[in-house]
């Protein structure tokens, strides 16, 4: 059961997404800061991306590997969390182990503590821990960037042809440096594009999309979509349209 407050999250949360300094941009995709205020516990659904995250919350720092499916985070009372989203592919040197070893896990931070996290304070710590350049990490990050930039890449075979590396080479590279397989990353970004189209009011041919993404049937596609987004494609689309209608009503003349 989805929390009825989900559509009203802006009344309870404030989000900031500062960009990293240029010297840290090869490692950090973005920072994220969330402030919240709830009078009773709220289960926040988190949709997965292929990023490793460093989070500072309540005096505790943790590192979360890539999640293979959506997860929930409980927010209660008034609080704040400061997070670092690392670029996909670059975290292995910080971790000192294959990134797949922390997939679907949250572990204590291996970085020095930051009692009062802010962009300058966290960047000072990150600079003190920068690893030596790793050509394999650069390669992995570049392959993920190519997936993001090329919507026509819908299968691992197409990615292999695009990069000149075999599917098994890509599997090993992603397990070591990204933490999850190339098929998952491809499907994740293609599904993100679908949700963007839904947000714009477009209708989606689910059966055709499932075939384009290499699913044997629509049922398997629905299963994976639900694992990522916490609801079926049709349920997700209906909720999006409900939110759009609410926003239009709120913005209409005489609505306030």
Describe the function of each predicted region:
Residues 1-167, 177-182, 196-200, 205-216, ...:
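Alpha-helical bundle regulatory/interaction domains
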């Amino acid at each position: 059961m989805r929390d009825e407050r989900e559509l009203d999250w802006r009344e309870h949360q404030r989000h900031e997404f500062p960009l990293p300094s240029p010297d840290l941009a090869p490692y950090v995709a973005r920072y994220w800061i969330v402030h919240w205020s709830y009078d009773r516990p709220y289960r926040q659904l988190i949709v997965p991306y292929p990023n490793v995250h460093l989070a500072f919350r309540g005096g505790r720092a943790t590192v979360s590997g890539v999640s293979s499916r959506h997860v929930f985070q409980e927010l209660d009372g008034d609080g704040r969390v400061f997070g670092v989203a690392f670029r996909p592919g670059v975290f292995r040197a910080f971790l000192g182990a294959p990134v797949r070893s922390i997939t679907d896990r949250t572990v204590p931070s291996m970085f020095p503590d930051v009692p009062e996290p802010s962009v300058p304070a966290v960047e000072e710590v990150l600079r003190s821990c920068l690893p030596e350049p790793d050509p394999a990490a650069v390669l992995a990050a570049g392959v993920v960037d190519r997936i993001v930039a090329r919507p026509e890449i819908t299968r691992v075979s197409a990615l292999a042809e695009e990069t000149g590396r075999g599917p098994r080479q890509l599997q090993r590279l992603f397990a070591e440096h990204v933490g999850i397989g190339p098929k998952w990353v491809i499907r994740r970004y293609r599904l993100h594009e679908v949700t963007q189209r839904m947000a714009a009011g477009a209708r989606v041919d689910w059966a055709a999309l499932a075939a384009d993404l290499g699913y044997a049937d629509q049922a398997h596609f629905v299963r994976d979509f639900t694992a990522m987004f916490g609801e079926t494609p049709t349920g997700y689309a209906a909720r999006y349209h409900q939110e759009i209608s609410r926003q239009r009503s709120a913005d209409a003349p005489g609505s306030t």
